């Protein structure tokens, strides 16, 4: 009798262990809420892996966590389009694609059209090029207003009018996001 009971308990315990081993971690389960998935991924990461996610591994990229299946993130800063691919250890072109990148007009030119639909199309075109070049993040557009003519980044903004900039930047970003960037 005791032997049968021990065998049943062993089978019962083994089935739970096997189920636990086959369970999908919460961070990989799309049915779970985003906050729960993020918390689970952070819980499973080492301190070194967390730092690596926040720290660049090269120009315009951040390391992933291969152990957990989290991929690298590639970015582009091009305020006038998507920057061509550059080498890891220099500013030379990496020649990953056999074409050249597009140069879009400065954002002040876009804002001067007062056309949110054009801003959305502009953003979508940049998003499509970013996708083609395997960029997941675009570091822009710059959402600021001119306060000083001496600001060396003014060319990245949509001008001095905060109302106009706010009306133009939203469709621009929505256009970029349509491409999954």
Regions of interest found by a model, annotated:
Residues 1-23:
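Bacterial Sec-dependent N-terminal signal peptides
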Residues 21-181:
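N-terminal beta-rich core of secreted/periplasmic extracellular enzymes
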């Amino acid at each position: 009798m005791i032997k049968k009971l021990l065998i049943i308990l062993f089978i019962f315990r083994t089935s739970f262990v096997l189920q636990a081993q086959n369970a999908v971690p919460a961070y990989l389960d799309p049915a779970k809420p985003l906050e729960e998935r993020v918390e689970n991924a952070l819980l499973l990461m080492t301190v070194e892996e967390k730092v690596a996610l926040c720290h660049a591994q090269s120009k315009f990229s951040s390391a992933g966590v291969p152990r957990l299946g989290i991929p690298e993130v590639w970015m582009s800063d091009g305020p006038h389009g998507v920057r061509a691919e550059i080498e890891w250890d220099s500013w030379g072109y990496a020649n990953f694609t056999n074409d050249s990148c597009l140069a879009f007009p400065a954002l002040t030119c876009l804002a001067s059209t007062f056309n949110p639909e054009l801003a959305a199309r502009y953003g979508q075109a940049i998003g499509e090029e970013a996708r083609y070049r395997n960029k997941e993040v675009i570091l822009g557009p710059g959402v600021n207003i001119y306060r000083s003519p001496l600001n060396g980044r003014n060319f990245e903004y949509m001008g001095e009018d905060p109302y106009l900039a706010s009306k133009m930047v939203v469709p621009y970003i929505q256009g970029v996001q349509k491409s999954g960037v």
